[in-house]
Every structure is written in structure tokens, then in C-alpha cells.
């Protein structure tokens, strides 16, 4: 069992006294290596014995090929053995028999040809290659072997004939390139041009034309280079279509003209390519054009190139999807940066004409920003206030307010009117918004506007309408109360808070209660604060409320302390014993309430807060008293509705544990009494149980 668990552990990890080197390990491995078995050398005494051996081997090979004719290795081994015996005629016979079985096997043809070449039978090898390429004209390795043999023999006309035969089968580009390299090696450039013409007719791809153009740059004139490029563009467009024209042709053509210092020709080529190629296929062309203008153009030309490029990009994108508002944003910013007012206005008008197809708010969220940006641009850049106001009105009339609205549009329109000094129009705009489609944000902005103008009566009216519209919004009640408190109307503030806490539905009622309690505490109304805490506990008997209540009692100064306090006094006084006693009563009430309702987790959090309080303000006895009430954790399991079990943490309090023990003692006494009544022999047990219970 120990060995099956893994390799043995090394207990002593100290270095060994004798170290083993890598050289020693390799030497031992070589010394211990077993010697491979070697076939003993056969020696033949005379020719008759050799013939007998050859006959026996031939019979074995014949048996092999007869049993499995389709296995190529048998034929190759047979032929190779005959070659080793210098029996070339027999070897040819074996190869020919193998070709009858495998006439399309490239490896067999190549081995046959190599055998003839090795034995200097060149004519036979040439005939074999002729047969091979006739039989398998699509196998490039046979053609290359044939061409290699012909060129090594110095038969260049024969090599051309082989190439011509091969080119009739329209091979791949490498074959054409090999033919061209042959003519270049022997200085036949006119023949190479003719090959290029046939090459581009068979493979009219851009890279083929680029190879031809590069050839003409090396061995031709500028006119022939231009002719090649022009023919390439025209031929590719006619045979493969306009989309097949590659940007690399324009780039190479323009760079060639730039090298000749024909900058106007190069610029015309770049522009022609950009105008006729789609943007997705002219990215690199545009990058080269930009570089060209930076090198040989002026600043305006460079900026125009960049703007044109991006403008083409955005035009294609909006053509594909006119409802892509993010593209319209970028398009408008581009025209703004260009400084052309008419172009910018045209883009904005085209953009806002793309009304969302449905009346769903999610489709309108990006669309309305087009109006906002358009109006701001008209206001700031062109100073056309009338057009900006018209844009806002168009947007508001276009939005289906019965289904949804956008507060930001109403607020932007109001701020616009304020900037123009039209305060009445701004109020009418916000009032119209509240009347048509009230929203919390509109109320908030309207109230903020009136507060800045110190129109507090208008603020009160707006707050009244706001709480009528949405009485569950706690922040509205709190802001209203803060306004009244700032105006030093405490009774109105209390009335607002009372209305708020009496609402049946609030989104965050605890926030309102806290604001109300903080208000009374800051005003020094401690009895009112206590009453609020008691009312809150009736609604929400939560540990946080009890803890906050206790903290409040600690922070309340006594009457004597209130009289002694002055505004200049900054020293912090210790907490009085009366405040500590009040806080302890709160903790005791809370603990009793949670104990009766068996709220264990809440009870633990309360005890932790109580213990922290005693550590800060209590004595050692008080701390020990609370620590004795702290529970211990235990893990239990409970059954779920789907008949599975889950593990949870439960708390066992010392008081509850003692009650359980007392109940167990009582049950033991009852059980003993039952046994005594049944058999009469349990008196001793009853006495022992009674003693245990009394103890």
C-alpha cells in the first residue's frame, strides 16, 4: 500500500559524499548499451554459388510481389536489389512491372528516373520523364525533374520546349516564375515579356502584374512600366470586375512615379484609386497617399486628405445603416472640426431626419442627443439663436410625450432660454413639461431654478405638486423639509416630516425617519426625538434602530450640562451615569424583545453593540455580564422543500441552554415516577432524580 501511493520520500536531503557527474552518467549508459545484432557477412566461393544466391533472392522477391502486388515497397526493394547486383535490365523490368500495377504513383516514377540518372542512362531517363509528364501532367515534381535534367544537359531549346508543354496545362504561378527565371538567366528578356503576357492572361491577379512591373523596372523603360500598370488596371477591371482591382497596384504605380519625381502623376494616381476603390479596400492606399502629401505636399493638402478619408468612412457607414446615431455624432464632429458651416448643418439635418422606426424609448435615447448637439452648435458657433430655438421646439414636438419623454430635453430648452434672458419662457417650458409629462428630474430642475432666484413661494408650490405626483419619493420630502428649515419655519418642517412618515408607500422610509430624527435632535427636542424612536420601533423593530436609540441616549446632555455649555467650550465631557443607565435600559428592552421573538441573528448583533458600549462606557462587571450572555456558534442541518439538506450556523445562548437543562431534569423526574408507578422498584431512581433536579 505504501509503495502504490507514489515514489518513496527522501528523508535525508543532505548531499552525498560522492557526487555523480553528467559525464559519468553518459559514459555508463554507453558502456551498458547492448550491441545491435549484425548480419554476418556472406562470402561466395565461386560464380555458381553467387548465381544460386541471386536465384534464391529473386524467388523470395517474386513471392513477395505475387502475394501482395499493391504494396509498393516490395517492388522498390526488388528493383533496388537488382540495381545493387548491377542487373540493370532486370531492374528496368521490375520497374516496368511495378508501373503496370501503379501507373500513377509519383514516387515510383521518380525512383525509376533517379535510378537511370545514377547509372548514367540519361537518354533512358529523358524518355522516362517524357512518359511520366505525359501520363501525369498535373504533378509538378515530375516537370521540375524533367526541366532539371534538360538544363543540366545544356539543352536550353529542349528546356524551353518542356516549359511550353507545361504551360499549356496552365500550372500555378511558381511554374510561370520558373520559366521567366530561365529566360532571365540566359538574357532573353523579350521572351520573358511574352511569357509575362501569357502569365497575366492565365493568372490576372494583382501580384502577377506587380511581378511584371518590377521586371520592367529592372530591364525595361519608364514607358513600358506605365504601360504594364495601365494595362493591369484595365484588364483586372474587365476580367475580374472593379472590386478586384487591388490597391497595391495603385500604390506601386504612384511610388514609381514619385521616384521619377513625377509628383503630379503620382497624386493623380492616388486620387484615381481612392475615387474608384471602396473604402474597405483602400485603407493602405490612403495611408500611402497621406505619407506622400506629407513629403511632397502642403499643410492644406494633408488636412484635406485626412478629412476626405474620414468623410468617406462615415458616408459608407451611414449608407449601410442610417439609424446608427453614433456614426452621425462622429460625422458631425468631423465637419465641425473642419469649420465648414454649411457642411456641418447639412450633416445635422440629415442626421435628425433619421427618426427611430418605433415608439420605444430605448430607440430614442441616442437620437435626441443629435438635436441637443445641433442646438448647442447653432447657439455657440453660428450664434443663430432663432435656429437653435427652432431645433429645440422641433425635438419637443417630435417626441411622443404620451408614451415617454426626456427630461433632459425640457431642461436643456429651459437653460437655453435662461441664457437668452427669457426667464418667463423658461418657466413656461418647465411648466408645460410638468403639465404634459411630469418627471422627478423636471421638478428637481424647476425647484433648483426657483431657489437660485429666491422664489420660495414658487418652490413650495412646486414641492406640493411634486409630492402629489410622486408621494413615495423620500428625497422630495427631505428636500422640502430642508427648505422650510432653512427658512426657519420649524412647525412647517415638522408637518412635512409627519406627512412623509405617514405615507403608506415610500421608496426608502428609513431615510425619512433618520432625517426626521436628526432634525429633532439637532434642534434639541430630545423628548420629541424619543417619541420618534418609539414610533419607529413600533413600525420596524430592527437592531439598528435600537442601537441608534441607545447612541442617542448617550449623546444627550443632562440639564445641568446644557446650562454650563458655551459656544467657546470645545472640550469633550465624559458621559454621565444617567445617560449610561438610559442607554442600558434601551439595550435591555431590545434584548428582551428579540429574545421573546427568537430573533437569534439580530440578537447577536445587538449583543455585540451592547458589548462595545460597555467596553467604552461600562465597568469590568458590566462587560462580564454581557459576555456571559454571548452565544456560541454551532452548525446544524435542515431539510429544504426539495428534500435536500443544507447546513447553517445556529446560535445557542447560555440562558436558553440552562432552560433546556432544567427541562431535561424535569423530564427525567417524570420518567422515574412513571417507572415507580409501573413496577414499584424505582424509588431510588426518583430520589436520585429529585436530588439532581434540586441541585
Curated annotation (Swiss-Prot):
Subcellular location: Nucleus
Highest taxon above the source species: Eukaryota
Chief location bin: nucleus
A GO biological process held by the record: spliceosomal complex assembly
Stretches that traverse the bilayer: none
Any Gene Ontology CC annotation: post-mRNA release spliceosomal complex
Stretches forming HAT repeats: 52-84, 86-118, 120-152, 154-185, 187-218, 220-259, 261-295, 305-337, 339-373, 383-419, 421-452, 454-486, 488-522, 524-555, 578-616, 621-654
Keywords: mRNA processing, mRNA splicing, Nucleus, Repeat, Spliceosome
InterPro entries hit by this protein: HAT, HAT_Syf1-like_N, HAT_Syf1_CNRKL1_C, Syf1-like, TPR-like_helical_dom_sf, TPR_rpt
Listed SMART domains: HAT (SM00386)
Pfam families linked to this entry: HAT_PRP39_C (PF23241), HAT_Syf1_CNRKL1_C (PF23231), HAT_Syf1_CNRKL1_N (PF23233)
Function: Involved in pre-mRNA splicing and cell cycle progression. Required for the spliceosome assembly and initiation of the DNA replication.
Quaternary structure note: Associated with the spliceosome.
Family, similarity comment: Belongs to the crooked-neck family.
Name assigned to this protein: Pre-mRNA-splicing factor clf-1
Species of the source: Neurospora crassa (strain ATCC 24698 / 74-OR23-1A / CBS 708.71 / DSM 1257 / FGSC 987)
Gene name as annotated: clf-1
Amino acid at each position: 500500500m505504501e509503495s502504490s501511493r507514489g515514489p518513496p520520500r527522501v528523508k535525508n536531503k543532505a548531499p552525498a559524499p560522492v557526487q555523480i557527474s553528467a559525464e559519468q552518467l553518459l559514459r555508463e549508459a554507453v558502456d551498458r548499451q547492448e550491441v545491435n545484432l549484425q548480419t554476418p557477412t556472406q562470402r561466395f566461393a565461386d560464380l555458381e554459388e553467387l548465381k544460386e544466391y541471386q536465384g534464391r533472392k529473386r524467388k523470395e522477391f517474386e513471392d513477395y510481389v505475387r502475394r501482395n502486388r499493391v504494396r509498393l515497397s516490395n517492388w522498390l526493394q526488388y528493383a533496388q536489389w537488382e540495381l545493387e547486383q548491377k542487373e540493370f535490365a532486370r531492374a528496368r523490368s521490375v520497374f516496368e512491372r511495378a508501373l503496370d500495377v501503379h501507373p500513377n504513383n509519383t514516387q515510383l516514377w521518380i525512383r525509376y528516373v533517379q535510378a537511370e540518372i545514377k547509372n548514367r542512362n540519361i537518354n533512358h531517363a529523358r524518355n522516362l520523364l517524357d512518359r511520366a509528364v505525359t501520363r501525369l501532367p498535373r504533378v509538378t515534381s515530375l516537370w521540375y525533374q524533367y526541366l532539371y535534367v534538360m538544363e543540366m544537359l545544356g539543352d536550353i531549346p529542349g528546356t524551353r520546349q518542356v516549359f511550353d508543354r507545361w504551360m499549356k496545362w496552365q500550372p500555378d504561378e511558381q511554374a510561370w516564375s520558373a520559366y521567366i527565371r530561365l529566360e532571365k538567366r540566359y538574357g532573353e528578356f523579350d521572351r520573358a515579356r511574352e511569357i509575362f503576357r501569357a502569365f497575366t492572361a492565365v493568372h490576372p491577379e494583382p501580384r502577377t502584374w506587380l511581378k511584371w512591373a518590377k521586371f520592367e523596372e529592372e530591364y525595361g523603360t519608364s514607358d513600358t512600366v506605365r504601360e504594364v500598370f495601365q494595362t493591369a488596371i484595365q484588364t483586372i477591371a474587365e476580367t475580374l470586375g472593379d472590386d478586384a482591382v487591388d490597391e497595391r497596384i495603385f500604390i506601386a504605380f504612384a511610388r514609381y512615379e514619385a521616384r521619377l519625381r513625377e509628383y503630379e502623376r503620382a497624386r493623380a494616381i492616388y486620387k484615381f484609386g481612392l475615387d474608384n476603390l471602396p473604402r474597405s479596400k483602400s485603407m493602405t492606399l490612403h495611408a500611402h497617399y497621406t505619407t506622400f502629401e506629407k513629403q511632397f505636399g502642403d499643410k492644406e493638402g494633408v488636412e484635406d486628405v485626412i478629412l476626405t478619408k474620414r468623410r468617406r468612412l462615415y458616408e459608407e457607414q451611414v449608407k449601410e445603416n442610417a439609424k446608427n446615431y453614433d456614426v452621425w455624432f462622429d460625422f458631425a464632429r468631423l465637419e465641425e472640426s473642419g469649420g465648414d458651416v454649411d457642411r456641418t448643418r447639412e450633416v445635422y439635418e440629415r442626421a435628425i431626419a433619421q427618426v427611430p422606426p418605433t415608439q420605444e424609448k430605448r430607440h430614442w435615447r441616442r437620437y435626441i442627443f443629435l438635436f441637443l448637439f445641433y442646438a448647442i452648435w447653432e447657439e455657440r458657433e453660428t450664434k443663430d439663436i432663432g435656429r437653435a430655438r427652432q431645433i429645440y421646439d422641433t425635438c419637443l414636438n417630435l417626441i411622443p410625450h404620451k408614451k415617454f419623454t426626456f427630461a433632459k430635453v425640457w431642461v436643456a430648452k429651459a437653460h437655453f432660454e435662461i441664457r437668452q434672458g427669457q426667464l418667463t419662457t423658461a418657466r413656461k417650458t418647465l411648466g408645460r413639461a410638468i403639465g404634459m409629462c411630469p418627471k422627478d428630474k423636471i421638478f428637481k430642475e424647476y425647484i433648483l431654478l426657483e431657489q437660485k432666484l429666491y422664489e420660495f413661494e414658487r418652490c413650495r408650490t412646486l414641492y406640493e405638486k411634486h409630492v402629489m405626483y410622486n408621494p413615495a419619493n423620500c428625497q422630495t420630502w427631505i428636500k422640502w423639509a430642508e427648505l422650510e428649515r432653512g427658512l426657519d419655519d420649524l412647525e412647517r418642517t415638522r408637518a412635512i416630516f409627519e406627512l412623509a412618515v405617514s405615507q403608506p408607500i415610500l421608496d426608502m422610509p428609513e431615510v425619512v425617519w433618520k432625517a426626521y430624527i436628526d432634525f429633532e435632535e439637532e434642534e434639541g427636542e430630545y423628548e420629541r426625538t424619543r417619541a420618534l424612536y418609539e414610533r419607529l420601533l413600533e413600525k420596524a423593530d430592527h437592531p439598528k434602530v435600537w442601537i441608534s436609540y441607545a447612541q442617542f441616549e448617550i449623546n444627550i446632555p443632562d440639564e445641568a450640562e446644557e446650562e454650563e455649555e458655551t459656544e467657546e467650550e470645545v472640550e469633550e465631557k465624559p458621559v454621565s451615569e444617567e445617560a449610561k443607565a438610559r442607554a442600558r435600559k434601551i439595550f435591555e428592552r431590545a434584548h428582551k424583545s428579540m429574545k421573546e421573538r427568537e430573533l437569534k441573528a439580530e440578537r447577536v448583533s445587538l449583543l455585540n453593540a451592547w458589548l462595545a458600549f460597555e467596553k467604552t462606557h461600562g465597568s469590568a462587571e458590566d462587560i462580564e455580564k454581557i459576555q456571559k450572555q454571548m452565544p456560541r456558534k454551532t452548525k446544524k442541518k435542515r431539510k429544504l422543500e426539495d428534500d435536500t439538506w443544507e447546513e447553517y450556523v445556529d446560535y445557542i445562548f447560555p440562558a436558553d441552554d440552562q432552560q433546556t437543562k432544567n427541562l431535561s431534569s424535569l423530564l427525567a423526574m417524570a420518567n422515574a415516577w412513571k417507572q415507580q408507578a409501573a413496577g414499584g422498584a424505582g424509588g431510588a431512581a426518583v430520589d436520585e432524580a429529585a436530588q439532581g433536579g434540586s441541585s
